[in-house]
Amino acid sequence: MVSAGHAGATKSDNFCPICGGNEFAEYRGRPRCSCAKCGSKERHRFMALVLRSKLVPKNIGLPVYHFAPEPSIGGVLLELFGDNYQPADLVPDTYAWSTVPVEQVDLRRPLDVFEPGSVGGFIHSHVLEHIPASIDRVVRDMNAALAPGGFHIFQVPVHKGWYREDMDPDMDQSERTRLFHQWDHMRQFGDRDFEERVLELFVGMERIDLSGVLDSDQLRRAAIPPSAITRHTGHTVYAYRKPSLKDDH
């Protein structure tokens, strides 16, 4: 928890949708980025707005998996989904803070972990760039694991340029950082071909239109750049729903 005395924090008319705080500080050159009360950044607050909206079903009755769980979003999900909330990670021991036991899940082969149609929802933020496996297979297998009516909500870092990846296990960490901005990233998502390279993996899923409940003014109040809803950015939330059986009739 970050205290209200967070260095550089200033009060404003902004409002954190996670904790209700109204003091925000600069972070990595981004003004009003970090909530002084809960430590949330722009992408966490945007995710919270989407999760709390009426667009996301809350009574699906199946496990809702949250990968690489962040404390701020984990609290929101536990509030919304109760016993159906399931945090998960490849290395669960790193989440000693979690009040819900974190399940060990390897996302390289999702259908080795999840039965088709057994999951109510997947939520993850800045996770797909880390997975040393075909991104096409990972996403499509996750979608296959969703039950009808289930949802898949995610964020990824988006950079200028084109998609590229290199999963060579022998690549030097400094070279990987140079190419992909972090030593454990396998790929970079680019704004030039994001629609074709990533969103087309969701063929057969319904894209949830966030503009119906969220607009640029709401984002500004939550100290989120309005570009997050108009462009592909690292803060942007992508939300999809698997058609229910009745939708097919």
Regions found by a protein language model. Name each.
Residues M1-G117, D215, T230-T236, P243-H249:
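Conserved N-terminal segment of class I S-adenosyl-L-methionine
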Residues T94, L111, I131-P132, W162:
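Activation segment
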Residues I123:
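A conserved beta-strand element that flanks and buttresses the S-adenosyl-L-methionine
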Residues H126-H130:
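Short catalytic micro-motifs in class I SAM-dependent methyltransferases
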Residues A133-H249:
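S-adenosyl-L-methionine-dependent methyltransferase catalytic module, highlighting the catalytic core
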